[in-house]
Amino acid sequence: MVIQSTEIVDTFAEAFKMWGSRMVITAENEKWALAAGRSVTGFATSVIGCKCEAGIEAELAPDWTPDGRPGVSVLLFGFSPDGVGKRLLERIGQCVMTCPTTACFNGLEGGERVVVGGKLRYFGDGYQASKLVGDRRLWRIPVMEGEFLIDESFGVQPAVGGGNILILGRDARTTLEAAEAAAEVMRIPGVILPFPDGIVRSGSKPGSKYKALPASTNDAYCPSLRGSAPKTALPEDVRCVLEIVIDGLTEASVRESMRRGIRAAARDGIVQISAGNYGGNLGQYKIRLNELVQGAA
Protein backbone atom coordinates (compact mmCIF):
# COMPACT_ATOMS: atom_id res chain seq x y z
CA MET A 1 0.00 0.00 0.00
CA VAL A 2 1.21 3.51 -0.84
CA ILE A 3 0.16 6.86 0.66
CA GLN A 4 1.42 9.73 -1.48
CA SER A 5 4.86 8.32 -2.35
CA THR A 6 5.37 6.42 0.92
CA GLU A 7 5.11 2.64 1.07
CA ILE A 8 3.21 1.29 4.07
CA VAL A 9 4.99 -1.98 4.74
CA ASP A 10 2.76 -5.04 5.06
CA THR A 11 3.78 -5.83 8.64
CA PHE A 12 2.54 -5.43 12.20
CA ALA A 13 3.49 -3.73 15.44
CA GLU A 14 3.79 -6.19 18.30
CA ALA A 15 2.38 -4.68 21.49
CA PHE A 16 2.17 -6.00 25.04
CA LYS A 17 -0.26 -6.36 27.90
CA MET A 18 0.47 -3.77 30.57
CA TRP A 19 -1.30 -2.03 33.44
CA GLY A 20 -2.03 1.67 33.43
CA SER A 21 -3.03 4.40 35.84
CA ARG A 22 -3.96 8.07 35.52
CA MET A 23 -2.92 10.86 37.87
CA VAL A 24 -4.64 14.24 37.82
CA ILE A 25 -2.20 16.82 39.16
CA THR A 26 -3.48 20.30 39.95
CA ALA A 27 -1.74 23.47 41.09
CA GLU A 28 -2.24 27.17 41.62
CA ASN A 29 -1.48 27.83 37.96
CA GLU A 30 -0.50 26.06 34.74
CA LYS A 31 3.21 26.63 35.35
CA TRP A 32 3.33 24.53 38.51
CA ALA A 33 0.95 21.87 37.23
CA LEU A 34 3.24 21.37 34.22
CA ALA A 35 6.34 21.47 36.41
CA ALA A 36 4.98 18.58 38.48
CA GLY A 37 3.84 16.73 35.36
CA ARG A 38 7.25 16.98 33.72
CA SER A 39 9.03 15.93 36.90
CA VAL A 40 6.82 12.92 37.65
CA THR A 41 7.25 11.62 34.07
CA GLY A 42 11.03 12.01 34.00
CA PHE A 43 13.16 8.91 33.34
CA ALA A 44 10.10 6.90 32.33
CA THR A 45 10.64 6.08 28.67
CA SER A 46 10.86 2.30 28.87
CA VAL A 47 10.11 -0.40 31.42
CA ILE A 48 13.37 -2.06 30.38
CA GLY A 49 15.51 0.57 32.09
CA CYS A 50 13.09 2.81 33.97
CA LYS A 51 10.67 0.34 35.66
CA CYS A 52 7.70 2.18 34.12
CA GLU A 53 6.60 4.28 31.16
CA ALA A 54 4.88 7.60 31.76
CA GLY A 55 3.91 10.81 30.04
CA ILE A 56 1.62 13.81 30.18
CA GLU A 57 -1.67 12.89 28.55
CA ALA A 58 -3.23 16.36 28.46
CA GLU A 59 -3.36 19.77 30.06
CA LEU A 60 -6.64 20.30 31.93
CA ALA A 61 -8.71 23.44 32.35
CA PRO A 62 -10.07 24.14 35.86
CA ASP A 63 -13.52 22.89 34.81
CA TRP A 64 -12.04 19.41 34.31
CA THR A 65 -10.22 18.96 37.62
CA PRO A 66 -11.53 17.81 41.03
CA ASP A 67 -10.56 21.02 42.84
CA GLY A 68 -11.28 23.55 40.09
CA ARG A 69 -7.65 24.47 39.48
CA PRO A 70 -5.45 24.16 36.38
CA GLY A 71 -4.00 20.70 35.98
CA VAL A 72 -2.47 17.95 33.90
CA SER A 73 -3.41 14.32 33.47
CA VAL A 74 -0.52 11.85 33.51
CA LEU A 75 -0.58 8.22 32.44
CA LEU A 76 1.81 5.68 33.96
CA PHE A 77 2.26 2.09 32.79
CA GLY A 78 3.93 -1.00 34.23
CA PHE A 79 3.78 -4.76 34.00
CA SER A 80 1.65 -5.38 37.12
CA PRO A 81 -0.75 -3.53 39.43
CA ASP A 82 1.77 -3.85 42.25
CA GLY A 83 4.53 -2.42 40.09
CA VAL A 84 2.35 0.50 39.03
CA GLY A 85 1.46 1.16 42.67
CA LYS A 86 5.12 1.27 43.70
CA ARG A 87 6.02 3.68 40.91
CA LEU A 88 3.08 5.95 41.77
CA LEU A 89 4.14 6.07 45.41
CA GLU A 90 7.76 6.83 44.53
CA ARG A 91 7.09 9.41 41.87
CA ILE A 92 4.24 11.26 43.56
CA GLY A 93 6.23 11.42 46.78
CA GLN A 94 9.38 12.73 45.13
CA CYS A 95 8.02 14.77 42.23
CA VAL A 96 4.47 15.95 43.00
CA MET A 97 4.32 16.41 46.77
CA THR A 98 7.60 18.34 46.55
CA CYS A 99 6.25 20.75 43.92
CA PRO A 100 4.72 24.01 45.23
CA THR A 101 0.89 24.29 45.40
CA THR A 102 0.11 20.85 43.95
CA ALA A 103 -2.54 18.26 44.76
CA CYS A 104 -2.81 14.79 43.22
CA PHE A 105 -6.00 12.88 42.42
CA ASN A 106 -6.90 9.49 41.00
CA GLY A 107 -8.03 9.74 37.39
CA LEU A 108 -9.37 6.20 36.85
CA GLU A 109 -12.57 5.05 38.51
CA GLY A 110 -12.60 1.47 37.25
CA GLY A 111 -10.16 -1.39 37.52
CA GLU A 112 -8.21 -2.54 40.53
CA ARG A 113 -7.09 -0.21 43.32
CA VAL A 114 -3.62 0.44 44.69
CA VAL A 115 -3.02 2.38 47.90
CA VAL A 116 -0.93 5.50 47.30
CA GLY A 117 -2.03 8.40 49.49
CA GLY A 118 -2.82 5.91 52.22
CA LYS A 119 0.90 5.10 52.34
CA LEU A 120 2.33 8.50 51.49
CA ARG A 121 0.36 9.97 54.40
CA TYR A 122 2.96 8.66 56.84
CA PHE A 123 5.27 11.43 55.67
CA GLY A 124 3.01 13.59 57.84
CA ASP A 125 4.57 11.93 60.90
CA GLY A 126 1.27 11.59 62.73
CA TYR A 127 -0.04 15.03 61.85
CA GLN A 128 -1.77 13.86 58.66
CA ALA A 129 -5.57 13.92 58.53
CA SER A 130 -8.14 12.19 56.32
CA LYS A 131 -10.97 13.90 54.50
CA LEU A 132 -14.10 12.34 52.99
CA VAL A 133 -15.62 13.88 49.87
CA GLY A 134 -18.67 11.73 49.10
CA ASP A 135 -17.26 8.21 49.08
CA ARG A 136 -13.79 9.46 48.21
CA ARG A 137 -11.14 9.43 50.94
CA LEU A 138 -8.30 11.90 50.64
CA TRP A 139 -5.33 12.60 52.85
CA ARG A 140 -4.12 16.03 53.98
CA ILE A 141 -0.37 15.84 54.53
CA PRO A 142 1.19 18.85 56.28
CA VAL A 143 4.15 20.38 54.45
CA MET A 144 6.14 23.56 55.01
CA GLU A 145 4.08 25.46 52.43
CA GLY A 146 0.70 24.28 53.74
CA GLU A 147 -0.95 20.93 52.93
CA PHE A 148 -0.57 18.34 50.20
CA LEU A 149 -3.89 16.72 49.25
CA ILE A 150 -3.91 13.25 47.68
CA ASP A 151 -6.39 10.43 47.06
CA GLU A 152 -5.99 7.41 49.31
CA SER A 153 -6.01 4.97 46.38
CA PHE A 154 -5.65 5.04 42.61
CA GLY A 155 -7.27 2.94 39.90
CA VAL A 156 -5.17 0.58 37.79
CA GLN A 157 -6.54 -1.10 34.67
CA PRO A 158 -5.34 -3.47 31.94
CA ALA A 159 -3.59 -1.50 29.20
CA VAL A 160 -1.51 -1.85 26.04
CA GLY A 161 2.14 -0.89 25.69
CA GLY A 162 4.65 -0.89 22.87
CA GLY A 163 2.53 0.08 19.91
CA ASN A 164 4.92 1.63 17.41
CA ILE A 165 5.67 2.92 13.96
CA LEU A 166 9.03 3.20 12.19
CA ILE A 167 9.57 6.12 9.81
CA LEU A 168 12.21 5.44 7.15
CA GLY A 169 13.40 8.54 5.31
CA ARG A 170 15.90 9.67 2.69
CA ASP A 171 17.55 12.18 5.01
CA ALA A 172 17.57 13.15 8.68
CA ARG A 173 15.75 16.48 8.36
CA THR A 174 12.82 15.10 6.35
CA THR A 175 12.50 12.11 8.67
CA LEU A 176 12.47 14.27 11.79
CA GLU A 177 9.89 16.63 10.29
CA ALA A 178 7.66 13.66 9.45
CA ALA A 179 8.08 12.20 12.93
CA GLU A 180 7.25 15.54 14.55
CA ALA A 181 4.10 15.86 12.44
CA ALA A 182 3.08 12.32 13.36
CA ALA A 183 3.72 12.76 17.09
CA GLU A 184 1.62 15.92 17.16
CA VAL A 185 -1.53 14.18 15.91
CA MET A 186 -0.94 10.92 17.79
CA ARG A 187 -1.49 12.49 21.21
CA ILE A 188 -5.12 11.58 21.78
CA PRO A 189 -7.07 10.83 24.99
CA GLY A 190 -5.95 7.64 26.69
CA VAL A 191 -2.52 7.59 25.03
CA ILE A 192 1.02 8.74 25.73
CA LEU A 193 4.22 8.76 23.67
CA PRO A 194 6.76 8.09 26.44
CA PHE A 195 10.01 9.03 24.69
CA PRO A 196 11.46 12.59 24.36
CA ASP A 197 8.75 14.61 22.62
CA GLY A 198 7.43 11.24 21.48
CA ILE A 199 10.33 10.28 19.18
CA VAL A 200 13.00 7.56 19.48
CA ARG A 201 16.24 7.48 17.50
CA SER A 202 17.85 4.52 19.33
CA GLY A 203 15.37 1.73 18.70
CA SER A 204 16.33 -1.56 20.32
CA LYS A 205 16.08 -5.30 19.77
CA PRO A 206 15.84 -7.94 22.51
CA GLY A 207 19.16 -9.35 23.67
CA SER A 208 22.78 -8.52 22.95
CA LYS A 209 26.16 -10.12 22.29
CA TYR A 210 26.92 -8.93 25.83
CA LYS A 211 25.18 -11.16 28.37
CA ALA A 212 24.49 -8.35 30.85
CA LEU A 213 22.35 -6.37 28.40
CA PRO A 214 18.64 -7.21 27.96
CA ALA A 215 18.43 -5.06 24.81
CA SER A 216 20.76 -3.54 22.24
CA THR A 217 20.71 -1.34 19.14
CA ASN A 218 18.37 -2.46 16.38
CA ASP A 219 21.19 -3.02 13.89
CA ALA A 220 18.87 -4.03 11.05
CA TYR A 221 17.57 -0.45 11.00
CA CYS A 222 20.90 1.39 11.47
CA PRO A 223 21.92 3.05 8.16
CA SER A 224 25.58 3.15 9.21
CA LEU A 225 25.61 -0.64 9.60
CA ARG A 226 24.32 -1.42 6.13
CA GLY A 227 26.83 -3.89 4.75
CA SER A 228 28.39 -4.81 8.10
CA ALA A 229 25.42 -6.06 10.14
CA PRO A 230 24.21 -9.62 9.39
CA LYS A 231 21.09 -8.24 7.71
CA THR A 232 19.45 -4.93 6.95
CA ALA A 233 15.78 -3.98 6.75
CA LEU A 234 16.56 -0.74 4.92
CA PRO A 235 15.96 0.08 1.27
CA GLU A 236 19.05 1.49 -0.44
CA ASP A 237 17.82 5.10 -0.40
CA VAL A 238 17.02 5.22 3.35
CA ARG A 239 19.48 7.25 5.43
CA CYS A 240 17.53 7.80 8.67
CA VAL A 241 14.99 5.90 10.78
CA LEU A 242 12.94 7.27 13.68
CA GLU A 243 10.47 5.38 15.85
CA ILE A 244 7.38 6.47 17.76
CA VAL A 245 6.23 4.27 20.66
CA ILE A 246 2.65 4.41 21.93
CA ASP A 247 1.18 3.27 25.26
CA GLY A 248 -2.57 3.39 25.81
CA LEU A 249 -5.30 2.52 28.24
CA THR A 250 -7.06 0.53 25.50
CA GLU A 251 -6.06 -1.27 22.32
CA ALA A 252 -8.49 0.92 20.38
CA SER A 253 -6.75 4.11 21.49
CA VAL A 254 -3.33 2.73 20.52
CA ARG A 255 -4.62 1.70 17.10
CA GLU A 256 -6.23 5.08 16.46
CA SER A 257 -3.05 6.89 17.50
CA MET A 258 -0.98 4.73 15.14
CA ARG A 259 -3.43 5.27 12.29
CA ARG A 260 -3.18 9.04 12.65
CA GLY A 261 0.59 8.90 12.86
CA ILE A 262 0.98 6.83 9.70
CA ARG A 263 -1.13 9.21 7.67
CA ALA A 264 0.63 12.29 9.05
CA ALA A 265 4.13 10.92 8.43
CA ALA A 266 3.56 9.77 4.84
CA ARG A 267 5.06 12.34 2.43
CA ASP A 268 7.74 12.93 -0.17
CA GLY A 269 11.11 11.89 1.22
CA ILE A 270 9.68 9.18 3.46
CA VAL A 271 10.41 5.91 1.71
CA GLN A 272 8.57 3.55 4.04
CA ILE A 273 6.55 3.40 7.22
CA SER A 274 7.03 0.12 9.04
CA ALA A 275 6.75 -1.26 12.58
CA GLY A 276 8.80 -3.22 15.07
CA ASN A 277 7.87 -6.76 16.02
CA TYR A 278 9.40 -9.95 17.33
CA GLY A 279 7.87 -12.35 14.85
CA GLY A 280 4.69 -12.51 16.90
CA ASN A 281 6.44 -14.49 19.64
CA LEU A 282 6.49 -12.01 22.53
CA GLY A 283 3.60 -9.56 22.38
CA GLN A 284 -0.08 -10.29 22.88
CA TYR A 285 -1.27 -7.73 20.30
CA LYS A 286 -0.48 -7.70 16.58
CA ILE A 287 -1.51 -4.40 15.01
CA ARG A 288 -1.27 -4.61 11.22
CA LEU A 289 -0.41 -1.33 9.55
CA ASN A 290 -2.40 -1.90 6.37
CA GLU A 291 -5.55 -2.59 8.38
CA LEU A 292 -5.13 0.72 10.18
CA VAL A 293 -4.68 2.68 6.98
CA GLN A 294 -7.69 0.99 5.39
CA GLY A 295 -9.79 2.13 8.35
CA ALA A 296 -10.25 -1.18 10.19
CA ALA A 297 -8.97 0.32 13.43
Which positions does each model-derived feature cover?
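Conserved mixed alpha/beta catalytic, RNA-binding, or beta-rich assembly cores of soluble enzyme
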Residues: 2-62, 81, 86, 90-241, ...
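Extended, highly charged
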Residues: 74-75
